[in-house]
A protein has these predicted regions:
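Basic, amphipathic alpha-helical/coil surface patches used to engage anionic, phosphate-bearing ligands
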Residues: 2-223
Length: 223
């Protein structure tokens, strides 16, 4: 948990007055930490309490800096009636985004649907190294979310994967997240996606459609 002290320096009559304000959010998080120190609390309960604290922060904090990137959003339902979460890899710049806020926004976006079956569509199109967070952050996210996030995730579609993406997904799902290994599906073309979801509902950015035509020809394009 992070603790924040905000120092407000005011200058008057040549003297410096320091006003120290304790962030109420940090006080609440500190209380959770104190409760988790109790030996009687089992690991599952501790994890749930930490996540509940994270969920509270996700609802209360200002996350517009992440929301404005539009890198993750809900996009209706697939053809089996499952909620769809869209992740645009190119719009996620880990060097320019607060990763703690990114996690909070992910939780705010995804948590309302995880009690039912849902799928994720990840567009790897035209990404660079700056769009790919560290393995340790991905592991942190996976270990932070609750069981429902993993159990009710029915498919994770990677659109326009590279060889590196395939190898990374295989390694992570084999050694760190075997519960989702069989849920990862690589899709080389948007036509592969059309059998699963209504593409019009996904709000696919134009650059993805353009790149798909470069990679796969004009078979996708429908004027």
């Amino acid at each position: 948990m992070f603790y924040y002290l905000f120092y407000d320096f005011r200058f008057s009559s040549g003297k410096t007055t320091v006003a120290v304000n304790l962030d109420l959010d940090s006080q609440a998080s500190s209380l959770v930490d104190d409760m988790l120190d109790e030996d009687s609390v089992d690991d599952d309960t501790k994890h749930r309490m930490r996540f509940d604290d994270l969920l509270r922060r996700a609802q209360e904090e200002d996350l517009t800096s992440v929301e404005d990137t539009n890198c993750i959003y809900r996009a209706g339902y697939d053809k089996q009636g499952r909620s769809v979460i869209v992740f645009i890899g190119k719009w996620f710049r880990h060097s320019q985004i607060n990763l703690e806020k990114a996690l909070l926004y992910l939780v705010r976006t995804v948590d309302p649907v995880v009690d039912q079956d849902y799928v994720v569509v990840y567009f790897h199109t035209r990404t660079s190294r700056d769009n790919i967070p560290s393995y340790w952050w991905i592991k942190h996210v996976y270990n932070t979310v609750t069981y429902n996030y993993k159990k009710n995730l029915k498919a994770f579609y990677v659109v326009h994967p590279t060889l590196w993406t395939k190898m990374t997904c295989w390694w992570f799902s084999t050694f760190m997240a075997p519960a989702i290994k069989n849920k990862i599906h690589n899709l080389n073309a948007l036509t592969d996606l059309s059998a699963i979801v209504n593409e019009q509902d996904l709000g696919i950015p134009m650059f993805i459609t353009e790149q798909d035509m470069v990679l796969n020809g004009l078979r996708y394009y429908q004027p």
